[in-house]
Amino acid sequence: RFSGCQCRYPTNNFGHCLHGGPQGWQYQVYEGQIVNDSTVTMTMHSPDGDANFPGAVTAVVTYTLTSDNAIDIKYEATTDKKTVINMTNHSYFNLSGDPTKPVTDHILYINADKYTPVDSTFMTTGEILDVKGTPMDFTQPHEIGRDITNFGFEQIKFANGFDHNWCLNTNGDDTQVAARVVVSVWKYTLTNRESRYTVVTSSTDQ
């Protein structure tokens, strides 16, 4: 409910509206602009009432390749009404260099002692649970594939793998490592200022 108006949103996931619905922003065409040799911006205009969401929104994503070969992503959005905006990056990385190979041999570390479980419709339950003693524990680095088919664990069954949110121990300190993935000679390290981190492995047969 926004500004006294109850809004109904299009559903696309077990009766829920996921990622803005079936025509979410990820499916829209953005206006690209080259800022300099290392930076581009992508801008999208969403009109008031788009997918029943209130407010005309201008969303801007800025991608910068830094001097130390990192990718910096910044999000901005302006709107003329109260609305819901929760922009993020949804990239997938396969460090093997071969997209036909699964990521089950990738070594994953997540700096998190807790996670938020989901129900059978893939909505978070509101609980915050300990990872210790469960397949959700990546505080000691190990292969993603070790428990990815452990369907006796309900959370893996619901997600058909991993598609969960971990509560980071970093407390918003972006000088600490939030997560790391290693395979062969390649390493992907994530830092951020947020308190949560989501890992998605697609389905177990991919």
What are these regions (language model features)?
Residues 1-206:
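An exposed, glycine/acidic-rich loop-and-rim segment of catalytic or binding clefts
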